[in-house]
Regions:
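Residues that form or immediately flank small-molecule/cofactor binding pockets and catalytic motifs
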Residues: 12, 92, 236
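Accessory, solvent-exposed terminal regions and/or long lumenal/extracellular loops of proteins
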Residues: 194-197, 201, 207-210, 221-227
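A glycine-rich, often tryptophan-bearing local segment used as a flexible ligand/cofactor-contacting loop or short
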Residues: 1-67, 73, 154, 158
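Short intrinsically disordered coil segments
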Residues: 148-149, 204-206, 233-236
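Solvent-exposed beta-hairpin/edge-strand motifs
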Residues: 84-89, 157, 212-237
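A glycine-centered loop/beta-turn motif at secondary-structure junctions
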Residues: 5, 9, 29-32, 59, ...
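Solvent-exposed loop and beta-edge segments used for protein-protein assembly and interaction
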Residues: 182, 210-212
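Solvent-exposed beta-strand/loop surfaces of large extracellular or lumenal domains
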Residues: 102-104, 108, 228-244
């Protein structure tokens, strides 16, 4: 949830707002009206299922590339979206290679069924924007680190905020960037954090071979009337090249 000015950006997923503080299921989810959805059911055990891309030009799918599918698993809340809601992703039920198969490789497993069951919806509420994921993309991204899941989440945040990014870093995707703001100063912390193998624990091991990086470009949005006086590396005090628009 983010509020700026009179606009509100709200992202939610799965069971957000579905329970009271005492853990009792609500008859109507606390966020359902804002999200523009009505809960109609639930699906469990969606291993080897997918989200089908309905519109590759949708802002939630920017940068996804040449694919029609995004991996999915776990549970999903079935909803009936309001007519004003856009549905960029729909559910493809579990793809099974054959009866009793424990693994299904999409290249060798025919997709026999598609649905119009939403996986994600977006729209407006008041003067703000809202996005609701019926599944748990943040958990799946945490568990598997699949890049497309991260891109969809990041795109949802950008679209909902409807404002320019305050920082943009042109670097390999394993570089972590953190921005801290203080009066008259911006501090950008970059961490070269390669991973030597994929993990499903959510914890990333440091790469065994650390390769130095160079020529990373950091772009920052300045406030009204602000100008950059100097930029330097905090560890060495070495001046850095600056270009101001």
């Amino acid at each position: 949830h983010h509020e700026h000015g009179l606009r509100i950006a709200n992202l939610a997923s799965f069971d957000a707002g579905a329970y009271t503080l005492d853990g009792v299921t609500r008859r109507t989810g606390a966020l359902d009206r804002m999200m523009g959805v009505r809960r109609t059911g639930r699906r469990e055990g969606l291993k080897s299922s997918y989200a089908r891309i309905e519109d590759a030009a949708d802002p939630l799918l920017e940068g996804i590339g040449d694919t029609d599918l995004i991996p999915n698993e776990g549970a999903l809340v079935e909803i009936a979206p309001d007519a004003q809601r856009v549905v960029p992703l729909t559910l493809i039920p579990p793809v099974i290679a054959h009866s009793g198969a424990t693994i299904s490789i999409p290249e060798y497993s025919a997709i026999k069924e598609t649905t119009d069951i939403p996986v994600a919806v977006r729209g407006t509420h008041g003067k703000g924007r809202v996005v609701y994921f019926c599944n748990q993309p943040e958990l799946l991204f945490y568990r598997y680190g699949f890049p497309d899941l991260g891109r969809v989440l990041a795109n949802a945040v950008r679209w909902a905020l409807a404002e320019p990014a305050v920082i943009d870093v042109d670097a390999p995707d394993f570089v972590e960037a953190t921005l801290m703001t203080q009066p008259g100063r911006r501090m950008v912390h970059l961490v070269n954090f390669p991973v030597s193998k994929p993990l499903n624990t959510g914890w990333r091991h440091m790469g065994r071979t650390l390769v130095p990086l160079a020529d990373i470009t950091v772009s920052l949005a300045l406030g009204s009337g602000e100008r950059v006086r100097e930029a330097r590396a905090a560890t060495t005090e070495q001046p850095l090249a600056v270009q101001q628009d």
